[in-house]
């Protein structure tokens, strides 16, 4: 059976991925693989506040629980995907990456990913 480490490694092998990070709702790292230029602990520490605001928005807009958030920056994107109520996957993506394919795969394999936690 695949593990969280296998998931992180598989995502990291995709073209254009700078980091794949699995973290708890509290922002603490569970597992990660990242380029040397990415401070995974620092990046993960910012995710809980983003999650809180995104979930508040979803509640106010009557959209339900957060499944995936995509934040686009000038130099790439950050994708945050819920693995369970207490674990999240953060993927840092370069502009050259196939973001659509990544999002499709995360959605298609959501149940399998959730089973890893």
Residue positions per predicted region:
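Non-catalytic interaction/Regulatory regions outside core domains
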Residues: 1-117
């Amino acid at each position: 059976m695949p593990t969280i480490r296998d998931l992180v490694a598989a995502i990291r092998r995709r073209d254009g991925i700078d980091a794949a990070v699995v973290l708890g709702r509290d922002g603490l790292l569970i597992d990660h693989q990242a380029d040397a230029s990415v401070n995974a602990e620092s990046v993960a520490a910012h995710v809980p506040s983003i999650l809180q605001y995104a979930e508040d928005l979803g509640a106010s807009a009557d959209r339900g629980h957060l499944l995936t958030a995509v934040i686009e920056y000038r130099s790439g994107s950050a994708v945050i995907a819920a693995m369970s109520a207490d674990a999240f996957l953060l993927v840092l993506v370069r502009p050259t990456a196939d973001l659509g394919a990544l999002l499709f795969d995360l959605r298609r394999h959501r149940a399998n990913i959730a089973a890893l936690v």
